[in-house]
Amino acid sequence: MDRFTPFFLLVILFSSNLLVRADGDEEDEGDKKKSEVGTVIGIDLGTTYSCVGVFKNGRVDIIANDQGNRITPSYVAFTADGERLIGDAAKNQLTSNPENTIFDVKRLIGRTFDDKSVQHDIKFYPFKVTNANNKPHIQAATGEGDRSFAPEEISAMVLSKMRDIAEEYLGKKITNAVVTVPAYFNDAQRQATKDAGTIAGLNVMRIINEPTAAAIAYGLDKKEGEKNILVFDLGGGTFDVSLLTIDNGVFEVVSTNGDTHLGGEDFDQRVMEHFIKLYKKKKGKDIRKDNRAVQKLRREVEKAKRALSSAHQVRLEIESFFDGEDFSESLTRAKFEELNMDLFRSTMKPVKQVLEDADLKTDDIDEIVLVGGSTRIPKVQQLVKEYFNGKEPSRGINPDEAVAYGAAVQAGVLSGEEDTGDLVLLDVNPLTMGIETVGGVMTKLIPRNTVIPTKKSQIFSTAADNQPTVTIQVYEGERSMTKDNHLLGKFDLTGIPPAPRGVPQIEVTFEIDVNGILKVTAEDKGTGSKNQIVIQNDQNRLSPEDIERMINDAEKYADEDKKVKEKVDAKNELESYAYSLKNQIGDKEKLGAKLSDEDKEKITEAVDEAIKWLESNAEAESEAFNEKKTELEGIVQPIMTKLYEQSGGAPPPSGEEESEEAEKDEL
């Protein structure tokens, strides 16, 4: 093989390690006033659950959704009658509508269709995943017929739901957010997450790493001097380990490692496979053919897993499970651990790696912070404790809310909130980035665990005489040959004047912004000719046109959701008003005793007619329900006015007292 000097030509592309393209992020980071930015929210966009928080009045509020829950399922569903459901409502109808209930999109976003993990996962999804230019798309039957959705579109719907939850609580419109991603997400996954925010109508001011956000939640009020913190973040679908030093508000990530395809969903799947095999052995029937049965099992297995964090044995009971037969089996904690022990043990490898990368020993770690719902599993806690020679992990933060908490603090800093302290956040890129040089060699420009933002340049040259063009191929990964690493993209630098090999000087610059998004530039120092890439040309990226179309689709869905809600509200108002009148007329001690027989009959006829109309026009539009209520009020109101005048009181405003009465009656 030819010897090569630091000069030979190569190809560089955009790098895959940090994904959000944030032009001018450093300004965002600056002292923007609240008047410019407004309130910024922090969103933990999780595989299985999402959470939103806001920093105000000197503290973080984690915001509950309309069901009173502080975490919201990352589920989207399309019902047979054309309604779109997001969150709890979507997850609650999974077993009755499995093919059109979409979840786990965080495991698809930013990945190619032929990715091994995607091919593994789609075997277990009840919904259909198709190949669109080697990008996974999800098929669903919507009110407008069958639709194909990019993972970014589904994530955008979840982000919109989290924004709606915040807007309802804050009573104002929100346009800016900090969104978290796994530390081990690559550039494509980060950029796709940023795109999802754009589709949702959110300006994602910053993408921050989940374990870093959790460290902020843990250490914001810690003032005891420098400490080494290890964050062990095992969630529903991803796993990260980050080692940080915290020193009076300065959070510096020293090293990070993880697995973007390991979490509670995998533990559930192992248990499901166990019960599917057991059922086949006992009954001779394969339930995999029935999506509803599989999703019923999924629901019960998740419940059982949670219960086994405190109990040692649980029983799973499912009525009419398959072919009309019930399901009843027990699961012990020991069996659950046996089914997943290799996965549990695999979490120790990244722990070992971050310590090695930081050149620290287990005894150098001052605090272990457990984050993510899966860290409630006793065996996981035991393995972590044993690895650190019996050291107890910190119990000070809520593992479900810590990431959103940290994101909300960062959001508070960006929006100029007071009392966020002198917070300084120094994060790192998780994977080495470089370009391919002669012979398929990976020439590294930015090593993993380099503090970001960062910029690094190196001079390369041509590999052949009179070579007019060089191709810059950008890779991420730790292997010495590019074939073993991940290609992020490539671009050409053309117009190089004829010259012997090794003479032209081509400067390649890698620049990673605060979001971990990579920009690669190549410049011919002789001519000043320049080209660059920010991953836009990668086939896995959405084009600006795609994003614009998806924004319009998202707005259309929001309008449709609003119309559905208006219809439901109008129907409920009419129904509530009619039944309230019916109940009051039937009450012989109240209104029923005060009305003349003639007036009573008049109202009764009108109410019965309205109820009958409701039964036969359940799918009417909101205007029709409102008109019917106005019509009913037109009959009732003069009678009520006459009644009040006879008793010497003022008449109630049009129908309001009765409808308020109705609401009180129904409490």
From Swiss-Prot:
Region (Substrate-binding (SBD)): 409-509
Domain of life: Eukaryota
Activity modulation: The chaperone activity is regulated by ATP-induced allosteric coupling of the nucleotide-binding (NBD) and substrate-binding (SBD) domains. In the ADP-bound and nucleotide-free (apo) states, the two domains have little interaction. In contrast, in the ATP-bound state the two domains are tightly coupled, which results in drastically accelerated kinetics in both binding and release of polypeptide substrates. J domain-containing co-chaperones stimulate the ATPase activity and are required for efficient substrate recognition.
GO CC annotations, alphabetized: endoplasmic reticulum lumen
Binding of ATP, residues: 46-49, 106, 236-238, 302-309, 373-376
EC number: 3.6.4.10
Biased composition (Acidic residues): 655-667
Free-text function comment from the UniProt entry: Probably plays a role in facilitating the assembly of multimeric protein complexes inside the ER. Is required for secretory polypeptide translocation. May physically associate with SEC63 protein in the endoplasmic reticulum and this interaction may be regulated by ATP hydrolysis.
A GO molecular-function annotation: ATP-dependent protein folding chaperone
Localisation: Endoplasmic reticulum lumen
Lineage: Eukaryota, Metazoa, Spiralia, Lophotrochozoa, Mollusca
PANTHER family linked: HEAT SHOCK PROTEIN 70KDA
Keywords: ATP-binding, Chaperone, Endoplasmic reticulum, Hydrolase, Nucleotide-binding, Signal
Family stated for the protein in its record: Belongs to the heat shock protein 70 family.
Protein name from the UniProt record: Endoplasmic reticulum chaperone BiP
Catalyzed reaction equations: ATP + H2O = ADP + phosphate + H(+)
InterPro entries named in the record: ATPase_NBD (IPR043129), BIP_NBD (IPR042050), Heat_shock_70_CS (IPR018181), HSP70_C_sf (IPR029048), HSP70_peptide-bd_sf (IPR029047), Hsp_70_fam (IPR013126)
Region called Nucleotide-binding (NBD), residue ranges: 135-289
Signal peptide boundaries: 1-22
Pfam families hit by this protein: HSP70 (PF00012)
Chief location bin: endoplasmic reticulum
Motif extent (Prevents secretion from ER): 664-667
